[in-house]
Amino acid sequence: MLLARMNPQVQPENGGAGPGSEQPPRKRKEVLVVKERNGVQCLLASRDGDEQPRETWGKKIDFLLSVVGFAVDLANVWRFPYLCYKNGGGAFLIPYTLFLIIAGMPLFYMELALGQYNREGAATVWKICPFFKGVGYAVILIALYVGFYYNVIIAWSLYYLFSSFTPTLPWTDCGHAWNSPNCTDPKLLNSSVLGNHTKYSKYKFTPAAEFYERGVLHLHESSGIHDIGLPQWQLLLCLIIVVIVLFFSLWKGVKTSGKVVWITATLPYLVLFVLLVHGITLPGASNGINAYLHIDFYRLKEATVWIDAATQIFFSLGAGFGVLIAFASYNKFDNNCYRDALLTSTINCVTSFISGFAIFSILGYMAHEHKVNIEDVATEGAGLVFILYPEAISTLSGSTFWAIVFFIMLLALGIDSSMGGMEAVITGLADDFQVLKRHRKLFTFAVSFGTFLLALFCITKGGIYVLTLLDTFAAGTSILFAVLMEAIGVSWFYGVDRFSNDIQQMMGFKPGLYWRLCWKFVSPAFLLFVVIVSIINFKPLTYDDYIFPLWANWVGWGIAGSSMVLVPAYIVYKFFSTRGSIRERLAYGITPASEHHLVAQRDIRQFQLQHWLAI
């Protein structure tokens, strides 16, 4: 492939004419051109002559591992298996796979192509439709919110890992300083009581449950979100270590993060395989796996099954956080992002499915040991990985080894996902503000330190309430809304046909009709459906038996609204900050920056019916 450099006279972004345009001093532009095998020359990048060229991944595998590492996170382990079990087992795979094909993969593909072609972060990528730049700011803010509490979950895993380096795991028995007088060894409990009155997984007084809630969280010392107390020094130290690891993984950009993921993205698969092989040899494991895979097609008649499948496929793939756009922006221009989208999204979903075998083999073992039904031990979320699984491990031969291995896996799953979220923030803002790009290391430190400071609220004695609030509202309806606007902005305002031409310039072929129809109709409809359902199904926030006060719910909606409001707010700002008539302001707002000179010539594609009908 031939790489050539040219230095033509490039027109300013606003075209230099018309009432809505500005005329900044002309700068020399450097255009990189790739000459493909068929002789067609494609634009690789355009930048000011005094700017540094955009870095790229050291190797293609660095990019793939980064995407897989981000998408495959803790939810693959603690949420999907339980959803599959409670929604008809194998039958749940039907709506899950359907939504993967018609919505998950198309959105995944769209974000990779968008970032790779424009070589920009989540905010500046909207030079394709300036009015929608607020969408970029919204997803950056959401990614920042997630960083506030996600790092705390990683810190919990690190604390558990340190606690595992003992001959006897601290959650094996009672008698520790954190245990209550009610602490009871589960082996001594009456199984009929567990089976008839409460789920085993919700039983509060087992050593594992008390270690988590009293030894780690110190939840018993808080009466609610209004009484969170001070940060706990043990978790504070763990959080500091996590933030330091994240900082040094990101401070030099993808050159360093691309190497870290060789460990963090591959290690979980090795550990998962080891846990699976050992798990299926345990007594009762087959019962757990049978419960996981049982097929109940009648459950497909229930709307909740389809809703769970839709929301899980969306959040599992991680579209909308600006991460995929940021990662793809460091690809080579002619990289085959179509193949990457299919490969990485498939790996993510297959991982979710396989992890269910490792989880339910252990749950079957737990049910067998305590002579209860599978439904009495099956659960999701933090209770699964910080109570049930550790308790099961404590009963195994060589429990210390298995605990260390398991929590190393959780650490790896969390670290690379958190790296992705922070990279979205750093790349998104650094591309928008050149001063931040010139001082990337300092900016990376500022982002890391900022997330650390806000995370302090989540490691207090009532921190779990703050974490639950953020987890529910920071990236719930708001991220669904942001991706809906992203899909509309790309498919309708920028245009599916133009977007397809961009992809053809990169890879030499246009997306098929199937992808174009999904982008324009199916994916937006899917997202609209999920947004509406998330609002309709909203219930006042709770944590176990604790009901959050009304004001806490309003604070949560304020957090959600703070990101969503950026979308219309930026449209209003852009409209009133642009000079010209109403028609001209609208035209400049929905026309790609590179075509603003056409607006001055009144050649406005978006004002023609053909633009909106094109596929």
Curated annotation (Swiss-Prot):
Dopamine 1 binds at residues 73, 143, 315. Palmitoylated. Palmitoylation regulates protein levels and neurotransmitter transport. The keyword Membrane applies. Keywords: Cell membrane, Cell projection, Disulfide bond, Glycoprotein, Lipoprotein, Membrane, Metal-binding, Neurotransmitter transport, Palmitate, Sodium, Symport, Synapse, Synaptosome, Transmembrane, Transmembrane helix, Transport. It is a multi-pass membrane protein. NCBIfam families: Na_transp (NF037979). This is Sodium-dependent noradrenaline transporter. It comes from Bos taurus.
